[in-house]
């Protein structure tokens, strides 16, 4: 367990790391790899993700990149970034619990291309006309993508459904609670949105 979030910059192997902030902090962009587990407890503080950003070679534009096979939980605080591209690029099993995620300059605050994603009692703030999150069946990822929104979550921004050409893996958007202040944008790549969206 660390109180310094810069520990996230040095993850290796099958790291199993807990971060618990003891004050507001700033950290460079970070990434997680397959087999790694990260629990980020902001403890009612603000973590600002700054430059340099991270990503795949040639596209290092994310404030964090969470790769397939990793497990990440963020809870109890505010995650912020001035990123003007994609703030959180997610391919992993991700839980956002009692969070505020602020990416007012980002095109996408949270882009989900793979994995199981739970947004619980969490506020996501996007800028005007931008995307709070998406559900994207991306490329050749074979695990599909499932996003569940529940509790008192507030989604300020658009939500997009899309998929890559040839991707036939399962996609789900399960809305079990929350307030949505934005448009649902269904890309032309989605031919049957009613098979993806479940409102209960």
PLM regions with names:
Residues 47, 79-83, 100-103, 119, ...:
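Beta-rich extracellular carbohydrate-active architectures
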Residues 1-22, 26-29:
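Acidic Gly/Asp/Thr-rich repetitive segments characteristic of extracellular carbohydrate-active
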Residues 40-42, 72-76, 94-98, 116-121, ...:
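All-beta strand scaffolds that present successive hydrophobic residues in beta-strands
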Residues 26-39, 49-75, 80-94, 105-114, ...:
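Extracellular beta-strand-rich solenoid/capping regions of secreted or surface-exposed proteins
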Residues 128, 159, 164-172, 176-179, ...:
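Extracellular parallel beta-helix/beta-solenoid repeat domains
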Residues 112-117, 123-133, 139, 183-184:
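Long amphipathic alpha-helical scaffold regions
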């Amino acid at each position: 367990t660390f109180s310094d979030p810069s520990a996230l910059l040095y993850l290796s192997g099958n790291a199993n790391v807990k971060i618990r902030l003891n004050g507001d902090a700033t950290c460079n962009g970070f990434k997680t790899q397959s087999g790694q587990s990260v629990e980020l407890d902001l403890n009612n503080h603000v973590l600002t993700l700054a430059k340099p950003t991270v990503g795949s070679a040639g596209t290092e534009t994310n404030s964090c990149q969470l790769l397939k096979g990793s497990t990440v939980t963020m809870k109890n605080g505010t995650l912020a970034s001035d990123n003007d591209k994609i703030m959180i690029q997610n391919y992993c099993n991700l839980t956002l619990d009692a969070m505020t995620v602020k990416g007012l300059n980002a095109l996408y605050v949270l882009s989900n291309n793979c994995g199981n994603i739970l947004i619980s009692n969490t506020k996501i703030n996007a800028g005007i006309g931008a995307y709070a999150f998406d559900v994207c069946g991306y490329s050749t990822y074979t695990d599909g993508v499932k996003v569940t929104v529940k509790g008192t979550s507030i989604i300020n921004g658009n939500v997009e459904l899309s998929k890559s050409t040839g991707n036939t893996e399962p996609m789900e958007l399960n809305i079990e609670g929350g307030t949505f202040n934005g448009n649902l944008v269904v890309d032309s790549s989605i031919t049957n949105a009613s098979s993806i969206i479940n409102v209960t």
